Amino acid sequence: MADPEKIIKVSVVTPDGIVYSHNATMVAMRAIDGDRAIMYDHLPIVTPLAIGEVRVKRTHEMNDRIDHIAVNGGYIEFSNNEATIIADSAERARNIDVKRAQSAKKRAEQHMQEAKEKHNEREMLEAEIALRRAVNRLHVRENYGK
C-alpha cells in the first residue's frame, strides 16, 4: 500500500463535467512530445496531450489498482500534488460503448476514402484524427474495460 503522505489528486475534466477524480500514486500519459509520468512532489508542469490512454495508479484498499482512460488530446496541469487533465472528451475504459466506437471508426475510414478520392488534404487530416480517436477508444476498452 502506498504511503498516505505521498498521494496526488487526479481529475479528468471535459466540457460535460468531471469524468474522473481519485487519489493516486502516479498518473502516466502520452504528451505530444512523448510519454510522461507524474508522481508526488513532481515539479509543476503544463503540457499538451496527444490522443491516447491515461493510466492512473491508485491505492485501492490493500493493493494498487490502475484505471485506464481514453483521452482525445487536451492538456495536463500539475502543481501542489494535484493533476488536472482537461480534454474535449475522455472516457473511462469501463464506460466506452464499443458499438459507438466501431461506428465512429467505420465513418472515419469512409471519410478518409472520400477525402482521398477528392484529393482534399484538410478533410483527410480531419478523418485521420477521427480515426485515431476511435481506435484509441477501442484499444482502451478492449484491453482494460473489463
Swiss-Prot record:
Function: Produces ATP from ADP in the presence of a proton gradient across the membrane.
NCBIfam families: ATP_synt_epsi (TIGR01216), PRK00571.1-3 (NF001846)
Subunit relationships: F-type ATPases have 2 components, CF(1) - the catalytic core - and CF(0) - the membrane proton channel. CF(1) has five subunits: alpha(3), beta(3), gamma(1), delta(1), epsilon(1). CF(0) has three main subunits: a, b and c.
GO molecular function, one term: ATP binding
Cystine pairs: none
Pfam assignment, any one: ATP-synt_DE
Organism: Lactobacillus johnsonii (strain CNCM I-12250 / La1 / NCC 533)
Membrane topology type: Peripheral membrane protein
Gene: atpC
Localization per Swiss-Prot or TrEMBL: Cell membrane
Keyword Zinc: no
Keywords, alphabetical: ATP synthesis, Cell membrane, CF(1), Hydrogen ion transport, Ion transport, Membrane, Transport
Gene Ontology cellular-component terms listed: plasma membrane; proton-transporting ATP synthase complex
CDD domains to which the protein is assigned, alphabetical: F1-ATPase_delta
Main location: membrane
Protein name: ATP synthase epsilon chain
InterPro entries, alphabetized: ATP_F1_dsu/esu_C_sf, ATP_synth_F1_dsu/esu, ATP_synth_F1_dsu/esu_N, ATP_synth_F1_esu_C, ATPsynth_dsu/esu_N
Family stated for the protein in its record: Belongs to the ATPase epsilon chain family.
Chain segments carrying region Disordered: 103-122
